[in-house]
Regions:
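Beta-strand elements within well-structured catalytic alpha/beta cores of enzymes
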Residues: 1-2, 78, 176, 220-228, ...
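Histidine-centered active-site microenvironments of extracellular/periplasmic hydrolases
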Residues: 275-318
């Protein structure tokens, strides 16, 4: 977060920081992120802590260590009070953090079972890149998560444009990226630094969620939105991509802030992180930074790997210079 603000300031030619919107909110605090069993938490235990206020063991979602029954989340409490509820993420909708708000599983990798729990809640809006393990690995002919949507009253929209068409008549909504985008990478929507025209964004998701949930404000709504790829960029130690993701997340918060500006007395926005990833450090023993050089990076680590793999495929995995490859392509 601080690195992003310093990076923004450097791009503007200023010393210090260029503040993000959410760092200027009136209240801030800190949290201790250890799980019930590990000094270093994972997203499942951390998500459960955020959703329920209870610490559990790593890998567990919505259940406590060695205990039954499962524990419910703030999203369930809101639904039980008559509020409309939405759960949204930039990664798969049955991933650890979103799952912690609606599912109960001893292992975060039980993606199919977590996805089935999604439909048991009756929440009004879900969004993410897609499902992981949409069919049961042990019985692929039953319990298809896409087919379960219609059976449980959910309308599936594929992409923001499709949402605009489908949402007016939908009672409950499941927004996923286009099938074409999922063929390229289903586990998440593209990084901000890799984004192409037509890609679904976290802003699209958040705008859709607020639009859908605010159809009826008589009892209010609860919405959880996760910028899930910030974590992944940090896992890759990819500073430039991380900064782009945080700026993109800040732009997403601006959409929520617009709603707050229209409903200031009824709206609470909480921005938090579940844990740190990657050991991000500013400085390596010197007294200066030069973050602005990162503006020259135009693709994420994932995107770069994809480009290299495509080049290898074109050259039958033979080592050739990029200049030679381009010349060959031009001649052919």
């Amino acid at each position: 977060m601080q690195g992003t603000e310093i990076y923004r300031a450097e791009l503007e030619g200023k010393m210090g920081i260029a503040p993000l919107l959410f760092t200027q909110f009136p209240y801030s605090t800190v949290a201790i992120t250890n799980s019930a069993t590990n000094r270093v938490t994972d997203s499942a235990a951390a998500g459960t802590a955020l959703a329920t206020g209870r610490k559990t063991q790593n890998s567990a979602i919505g259940v406590l260590k060695d205990q039954e029954p499962p524990i419910s989340s703030v999203a369930v409490w809101a639904k039980n009070k008559g509020c409309r509820v939405g759960i949204a993420t930039s990664v798969t909708v049955n991933h650890a953090t979103p799952g912690a708000f609606y599912a109960h599983a001893a292992k975060r990798t039980l993606y199919h079972e977590i996805g089935k729990d999604l439909y048991k809640t009756g929440f009004d809006f879900y969004a993410g890149s897609d499902f992981r393990d949409a069919t049961d690995k042990n019985n692929p002919t039953t319990d298809n998560l896409y087919e379960m949507a219609g059976k449980n009253g959910y309308t599936i929209a594929r992409g923001y444009k499709d949402y605009l068409k489908q949402s007016k008549k939908a009672d409950k909504m499941l927004l996923l990226q286009t099938e074409e985008a999922s063929k390229s990478e289903f586990v998440a929507i593209p990084y901000a630094i890799d984004r192409k025209k037509g890609d679904m964004t976290l802003q699209d998701i958040t705008r859709s969620a607020i639009n859908f949930l605010s159809k009826d404000l008589s009892k209010g709504f609860f919405l959880m939105v996760e910028g899930g790829r910030i974590d992944w960029a940090c896992h890759s130690n990819d500073a430039a991509t991380t900064f782009h993701e945080i700026i993109d997340f800040d732009n997403t918060i601006k959409i929520a802030y617009e709603f707050y500006s229209q409903h200031p007395d009824e709206t609470l926005i909480v921005v938090t992180a579940d844990h740190e990833t990657g050991g991000f450090v500013l400085g390596t023993g010197t007294y200066d930074l030069n973050l602005q050089v990162l503006k020259n990076q135009k693709v994420s680590e994932n995107g770069f790997t994809r480009i290299v793999n495509e080049m290898r495929a074109k050259t039958n995995n033979q080592a050739v210079s990029y200049t030679h490859l381009r010349a060959h392509e031009t001649l052919s």
